[in-house]
Amino acid sequence: MLQVDRRLIEVFENFDYGGASRSFERSVDSLQSEGWNDRISSLRVVSGRWQICRHNGYRDCREIGGDESRLPSDWNDAISSLRPLRPFGED
């Protein structure tokens, strides 16, 4: 049986994984449509590697592969899009 590599990130409204939260398994080119634009202060990467971006359409991004209990000030409440990254060599 073929097993699919699942990617999952959980985002939080406050530092230290507090406040409202939401999980994503897919790319979101505008978090505004999900009610999460510029609201994320901490996050947990449950599986995979992710790209978080300060602008819609995946612009001004950085790659993350682990939990962040306190996003740096220039990323706190500044994320507008996110997407899972494929492992190296995957089509």
What does each of the following model-derived ranges do?
Residues 1-91:
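Compact beta-sheet-dominated domain cores in extracellular/mature segments
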